[in-house]
UniProtKB/Swiss-Prot annotation:
Keyword tags: ATP-binding, Cadmium, Cadmium resistance, Cell membrane, Copper, Ion transport, Magnesium, Membrane, Metal-binding, Nucleotide-binding, Translocase, Transmembrane, Transmembrane helix, Transport, Ubl conjugation
Entry protein name: P-type cation-transporting ATPase
Primary location recorded for the protein, binned into one broad class: membrane
Listed result of changing R970G: Confers localization to the plasma membrane and cadmium transport function
Localization per record: Cell membrane
Keyword Membrane set for record: yes
Gene Ontology CC annotation, any one: proteasome core complex
Entries under PROSITE patterns matching the protein: ATPASE_E1_E2 (PS00154), HMA_2 (PS50846)
Domain of life: Eukaryota
Transmembrane segments: 557-578, 593-612, 621-641, 660-680, 809-831, 848-865, 1162-1181, 1191-1209
Region annotated Metal-responding degradation signal, chain positions: 250-350
GO BP annotations listed: cadmium ion transport; detoxification of copper ion; intracellular monoatomic cation homeostasis; response to cadmium ion; transmembrane transport
């Protein structure tokens, strides 16, 4: 938009209004400290509680009332009186003087009209506002609207406030798009039924004048000073519309649709001066930001650095804590969707959603039906009767979700506390299955975690957690996977602390404990140390270190189970004493006391089992282990009650067992669960890669002072010192010192790696004898350790095929046990009556004892845990040796590897080509210069080698345009004089018959040809060195009977020479292979079309090891794709296994870990089958001379699960 077009048509008019140079004001406000701005506003309210006054009109007359000030403003608005009353000095505005920051009053240009819908008096703006139509609710941000991409809606105060010069009050507001892609036109803004219109009945001082002009909404309001607008913006792709938006915003030129032209005063000379000023201002800002857009590509980051509002569409901000800050500069909403009014400090009020603190709650249908509010706002200094009309939008529940503030999908991670077996996991999956908004679900019993993609248009996280809590007994908590977090200890109650003003960069607060707050923040805006030390108005301190959420959830659940078990033991001991003491067991008082204690155990300790079993039956249609516990313990307890009743009436039953059976049964079950949880928690924690993270760092400030700090307080820009033999706290670049670093625990590299200035160091590695000064490059939560741990966790969330088999067996196990129990009960009644000649009552009692024992001694959990516990340990063991399994299926099949296919360059070789011979024809300098211009910037190893070689010889690159790389073939471009330049593989360029090319190929070199207009100008012979462990790895793989292959896009001579050195058959190599040909070759092997007849008995398992982008298709096609870490990110994403260090012997590590893991899985299956078989036979009385007493059957879970966990843990100490 051209400046002259923007300001055309301006002239004199009867209606006049004031103009404020908002560029100067906004820069001054944005550069000011936020806390200082807020402090000033508080002081201003304390000194002047009169309302809005004009700086020149009213400040010099302190006794003026708000009504008098407003009356003068209306006189200016309607009669065009002396403009100096309003302080509208254009010269001051233009020169950036003090008056540019003074409060100014916007005059209105027509008389008030009554809005027919709400009955509110609204000042007309000489346009559509007079009709009371929809435009009265349209507005724009900072006087500028998104013309073709989106429109932002802003709720601002329409009230008058007294402020001193240069004081900028901070107004909180939210902006909400009505569609996920943003509003496409001003017609997308529509008015909705307001909640509690009583609060909006009076607009005497709160006038909001809105009209539209040239498809751009313009807004003006009665406002002393331009308020700083705070939004949370998500930068989008910036374009020229952003430049126009910023330029318009800087000018603060308010134009309205209609025939009435608006000027600064009634004087034509003043109008001309004003128009000239705004035109110049617009042009200056337009040119400035056009240049920034051209150079940086994104203006948002530049504005963010300056503390300014983004030029792109803002998004809604939310607080997921228990309450939002009363002083925070942002507004928040809860799931109720209702706007309420909440008292804050002083005489401020805030439109809020916290129904718990509401003075009133909206009862309109718009709030009861809508889950989302259109607009929230902070109103300063006035009561609800003075709040002007709220600009709201149409209900948008189909487009906007409270948790994310937009449509689309969001990746959610939930911690799940309370899962103990695969039955629990199956129940969780069924509960998720009832939710249409959940997709891509992954659950992990071992990690106690669930991940899924949430369709925000169909539900929120709160809805999901509410449904899960209703249908299952587990406890859920969302784990944040965005930004950074830090826990701090606050000096008073956490619920009060969240009402403190939030520093810039803080996005969310969450109450962890009574006086511990978890802060979510953007580390690029504010560092953790600054946040803790200087971010708050009250002193806070960093909280004690807590484990990763997945481990922390397990710890908390372990504590709960431990406390419950301890209580059960305490209550059971007196029962056992009274039952086993001969002098006490026959007394009614003793038995009555036992009954009371047993009842507490049955309904307090074992009570959750009842609820869990009922939820599983009702909501998930599952019969699980909890049902067996409920049936067995209930039978024992009811039998004891009945037996006690007979004893009281003087007809005791033959059995002497009373309440000790049910009580001891419950207690032993709890002991078994506690020990199992403890072993499982220790197992997971022991192989956690995050345990390698150091806990402290030595910070070096600008003066050289050294301070030891908690590692969580590191922030961008820090320099830390690494002492000899200490662990490196986080990733960084060495800026001073030299040493050798042991990276074995991170990369598996056994030899120390030399480090010097500009070397990269990674978190978790151990420094040698030297001292290093390192500049931080990655924060602890995003460093190498965290990245590796994330990939390992992803593998733990996947399930191998063998796990599906185990789950299927476990699902039939409980119904089978119930059937065996019924059969056992019936058989023992028959045996008691027919064989043992017992009375019917005695036969029934005996049958009940055997039935109870069968129910409780069996353990389906051992079958479900046999696979996942081993795979979790295996993935951790492999990670500590530099091998990252990205899926459990890779662990399952790697031990069956039958073929290993290698890419040559960068995989079998170092990937660092060197030029050994050069042939240049014609003008040598010109050819080399053109070639350097062509290859410079191309990331292919050959192009990089050529460019490096030419630069070392002092060649200067010529300008080459239209450069394009064709993967696996060539790179081409055009010289400044129009010459067609090509370089690359001689075969694809059609020069393989050139004598120089043939000579180089015969010698086994890789050949690079350079042609100009189709004629060969230069030929380069290159060679690459084998990796140090290539020969030994190939030999060991061959000894295991694995077939070896080489695929390469390189020349045939170089590939065959490499194969000969490694002893690989010529029939198993392919040269000049394109990515598609590599994929086809691997596919033939996988499908058995390229295998020996001896290997046709089972499907081949093919491992393809590559590093480049051109290997990505092959990595996907193979059974297992292995990526070398120094390769491209595309290849890394396509791979199933990632090698942290480019060492080929890691392939052997991968296969060995898989072999040992699968051996332990089979061993666990064997144990689970053996245990359940013999335990059930013993419990059912199959052995005449021996059977398990029912009170000791509760040890079954302990006896069955501990060996499984023990076998898995032994993998840590296996020789790999």
């Amino acid at each position: 938009m051209k400046p002259e077009k923007l300001f055309s048509g301006l002239g004199t008019s009867d209606g006049e209004y004031g103009v404020v140079n908002s560029e100067n004001i906004s820069i001054d406000a944005m550069q000011d400290n936020r806390g200082e701005c807020h402090r000033r506003s508080i002081e201003m309210h304390a000194n002047d509680n009169l309302g809005l006054v004009s700086q020149r009109d009213c400040t010099n007359r302190p006794k003026i009332t708000p009504q008098e000030c407003l009356s003068e403003t209306e006189q200016i608005c309607h009669h065009g009186e002396n403009r100096t009353k309003a302080g509208l000095d254009v010269d001051d505005a233009e020169t950036g003087g003090d008056h540019t920051n003074e409060s100014r009053v916007d005059e209105c240009c027509a008389e008030k009209v009554n809005d027919t819908e709400t009955g509110l008096d609204v000042d007309s703006c000489c346009g559509d506002a007079q009709t009371g139509g929809d435009h009265t609710n349209e507005s724009c941000v900072d006087g500028c609207c998104v013309r073709d991409s989106s429109v932002m809606v802003e709720e601002v105060t329409g009230s008058c406030e007294a402020v001193s010069s240069k004081e900028q009050l901070l107004t909180s507001f939210e902006v909400v798009p009505s569609k996920s892609e943003g509003l496409q036109s001003i017609h997308d803004i529509r008015e909705t039924t307001r909640c509690n219109t009583n609060s909006n009945q009076h607009t005497g001082k709160g006038r909001l004048c809105i009209e539209s002009s040239d498809s751009t909404l313009k807004k003006r309001s009665c406002k002393v000073s331009r308020q700083k607008i705070e939004v949370s913006s998500k930068p989008e792709c910036c374009n020229i519309s952003c430049v126009e938006r910023i330029a318009s915003r800087s000018c603060e030129k308010r134009t309205f649709k209609g025939s009435t032209n608006v000027g600064i005063s009634g004087s034509s000379s003043t109008d001309s001066l004003s128009e000239k000023f705004f035109s110049e201002q617009y042009s200056r800002m337009y040119n400035r930001y056009s240049s920034i857009l051209k150079n940086l590509g994104c203006i948002c980051n530049y504005l963010r650095t300056l503390g300014k509002e983004s030029c792109c569409l803002p998004k809604v901000r939310f607080c997921s804590g228990e309450g939002a800050s009363k002083k925070t500069k942002y507004s928040y909403r809860n799931s109720s969707g209702c706007l309420t009014k909440k008292k804050t400090h002083g005489d401020k009020e805030r439109l809020s959603n916290d129904n718990g603190h509401a003075d009133f709650v909206c009862s309109k249908s718009c709030c009861t039906k809508m889950k989302d509010c259109a607009v929230t706002s902070t109103i300063s200094g006035h009561s609800s009767s003075e709040i002007s009309r709220i600009v709201s939008m149409e209900p948008i529940e189909n487009h906007l979700n409270l948790e994310a503030g937009s449509t689309g999908t969001e990746h959610i991670v939930l911690s799940v506390s309370g899962m103990s077996c695969t039955g629990c996991e199956s129940k969780l999956k069924k509960s998720f299955g009832a939710l249409k908004c959940v997709h891509g679900l992954k659950t992990s019993l071992i990690l106690s975690q669930a991940e899924f993609n949430l369709d925000l248009a169909q539900g929120s996280v709160k809805d999901v957690i509410k449904h899960l809590s209703k249908t299952t007994e587990f406890k859920y908590e969302q784990i944040s996977n965005h930004g950074s977090t830090i826990d701090v200890v606050v000096p008073y109650a956490a619920k009060d602390f969240i009402n403190e003003e939030w520093p810039q960069g803080v996005t969310e607060l969450k109450i962890v404990e009574r006086n511990i707050i978890r802060i979510y923040f953007d580390p690029k805006v504010i560092g953790a140390r600054d946040l803790v030390n200087e971010g708050w108005s009250v002193p806070v301190s960093i909280a004690p270190f807590s484990c990763h959420p997945t481990i922390e959830v397990g710890r908390k659940h372990l504590v709960r189970v431990g406390c419950t078990t301890a209580l059960s033991i305490i209550l059971t001991i007196p029962i056992l004493v009274m039952a086993w003491a001969p002098q006490l067991r026959e007394k009614i008082s003793t038995i009555s006391a036992s009954m009371v204690l047993a009842t507490i155990i049955q309904f307090v300790i074992a009570g959750p089992f009842y609820l869990n079993a009922l939820k599983s039956l009702i909501f998930s249609r599952l019969i699980e282990m909890d049902l067996l516990i409920v049936l067995s313990t209930s039978a024992a307890y009811i039998f004891s009650i009945v037996s006690f009743g007979y004893f009281v009436v003087g007809r005791p039953l033959s059995t002497e067992q009373f309440f000790e059976t049910s009580s001891l049964l419950v207690t032993l079950i709890m002991v078994g669960r506690f020990v199992s949880e403890l072993a499982r928690h220790r197992a997971v924690k022991s192989i956690s890669v995050r345990s390698l993270q150091a806990s402290s760092a030595i910070l070096v400030d600008k003066t050289g002072k050294e301070t030891e700090i908690n590692i969580r307080l590191l922030q961008y820009g820090d320099i830390f010192k690494v002492l000899p033999d200490s662990r490196i706290p986080t990733d960084g670049t060495v800026i001073s010192g030299s040493s050798e670093v042991d990276e074995a625990l991170i990369t598996g590299e056994s030899m120390p790696v030399p480090k010097k200035c500009q070397s990269i160091v990674v978190a978790g590695s151990v420094n040698g004898t030297g001292t290093l000064f390192v500049k931080l490059s990655k924060l602890p939560g995003n460093n190498t350790i965290s990245t590796i741990a994330t990939m390992v966790d992803e593998a733990k969330l996947t399930k191998p095929k063998i796990q599906n088999i185990a789950d299927k067996i476990a699902s039939y196990f409980v119904p089978t046990i119930i059937g065996i129990t019924v059969v056992t009960f019936c058989v023992w009644i028959a045996v008691g009556i027919r064989v043992e000649k017992q009375s019917r009552s005695d036969a029934v009692i005996q049958a009940i004892i055997y039935a109870i024992t069968v129910l409780i001694v069996s353990c389906p959990c051992v079958i479900g845990l046999a696979v996942p516990i081993v795979f979790v340990i295996a993935s951790g063991v492999a990670a500590k040796r530099g091998v990252i399994f990205k899926s459990a299926e890779s662990i399952e099949v790697a031990h069956n590897t039958s073929h290993v296919v290698f890419d040559k360059t960068g995989t079998l070789t170092e990937g660092k080509l060197t030029v050994v011979h050069e042939t240049v024809r014609g003008d040598r300098h010109n050819s080399q210069s053109l070639l350097l211009g062509l290859t410079e910037g191309i990331k292919h190893p050959v192009s990089m080698a050529i460019a490096s070689y030419l630069k070392e010889k002092g060649v200067s690159a010529q300008n080459v345009s239209n450069t394009k790389a064709v993967t696996g073939k060539r790179v081409e471009g055009t010289s400044y004089s129009g010459l067609k330049l090509q370089g690359g593989n001689c075969r694809w360029l059609g020069h393989n018959n050139d004598p120089d090319v043939r000579k180089a190929l015969e010698q086994g070199y890789s050949v690079f040809c350079f042609s100009v207009n189709g004629s060969v100008t230069a030929v380069y012979a290159l060679e690459d060195s084998l990796r140090a462990d290539a020969v030994s790895t190939i030999n060991l793989l061959r000894q295991r009977g694995i077939s070896l292959h080489i695929l390469s896009g390189d020349d045939d001579g170089a590939v065959r020479s490499m194969a000969a050195r490694l002893g690989i058959e010529s029939s198993n190599i392919r040269s000049h292979a394109t990515p598609a040909e590599k994929s086809e070759y691997i596919k033939d092997i996988v499908e058995g079309r390229n295998c020996d007849s001896s290997s046709q008995s089972k499907r081949p398992v093919v491992v393809f090891c590559g590093d480049g982008t051109n290997d990505a298709i092959g990595l996907t096609q193979a059974t297992i794709g292995v990526h070398i870490n120094e390769g491209s990110e595309v290849a890394k994403l396509a791979a199933d296994v990632v090698m942290l260090k480019p060492k080929l012997n890691n392939i052997l590590t991968m296969i060995t870990v898989s072999q040992k893991a699968m051996f332990r899985v089979k061993l666990n299956f064997l144990w689970s089958f053996t245990y359940n078989l013999f335990a059930i036979l013993l419990a059912a009385g199959a052995f005449v001379d021996f059977h398990i007493p029912p009170e000791y059957a509760g040890l079954g879970e302990l006896v069955s699960i501990l060996p499984v966990i023990f076998v898995a843990i032994l993998l840590r100490y296996a020789k790999i």
